[in-house]
A protein has these predicted regions:
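Signature of dsDNA virion morphogenesis modules
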Residues: 1-171, 175-176
Length: 178
């Protein structure tokens, strides 16, 4: 989309993350979320970033094989209010910036004309549908609980496989999840 985010700008932007709404436009005909919409006022608020978002930079390998660094935080999803909110985990995510807060300039970087942000604040974190590509390849809502369950399942499969392939060898594996 022609945007260039420096680490200095990212650090400033993250400070505006608390209380940012989780926004979405749900299309009941297609049973999925859509895009940003024609106007930013479309859709519903499906959640919020808490005051203390537990923010961290994390590396994730995207489906294209490239490892990228993403900003991750806790969010509260209003799943009891809206049935469709239960399908948010796994959906792509895009950030929306508050237009009057945006400052920056167009610059050529590596032969490409890009908008380099210097100031902005969050307006929302937008839930995207299956057919909508996010600005940042692997940006998505995920559940730590689901990730942890997957890790435990993988460890259990490893143990079963190990027991089958090495009846004579005994190995003790201790896990500590914290």
């Amino acid at each position: 989309n022609g945007a260039y985010v420096t680490s200095e700008f990212a650090d400033k932007l993250i400070k505006t993350l608390p209380y940012t709404p989780i926004k979405g436009i749900y299309d009941s005909f297609n049973d999925d979320f859509s895009d940003h919409g024609a106007r930013r006022a479309e859709g519903r608020i499906y959640g919020i970033v808490p005051e203390n978002p537990n923010f961290a930079w994390e590396e994730h390998q995207d489906s294209d094989g490239v490892t990228r660094t993403y900003g991750c935080s806790d969010v509260l999803i209003f799943s009891a209010l809206y049935e469709e909110a239960n399908s948010i985990v796994g959906k792509a995510q895009s950030m929306e910036l508050y237009t009057p807060s945006i400052k920056g300039s167009w610059q050529f970087i590596n032969g490409k004309r890009l908008y380099v942000y210097t100031e902005a604040c969050f307006l929302g974190l937008q839930i995207l549908g299956e057919d909508v590509e996010p600005c940042f390849e692997g940006a998505a809502f995920f559940s730590f609980c689901d990730s942890l369950k997957g890790l435990v399942e993988n460890m259990e499969r490893f143990n079963l496989q190990f027991e089958k392939t090495s009846e004579e060898t005994q190995m003790i594996v201790n896990y500590k999840l914290s």
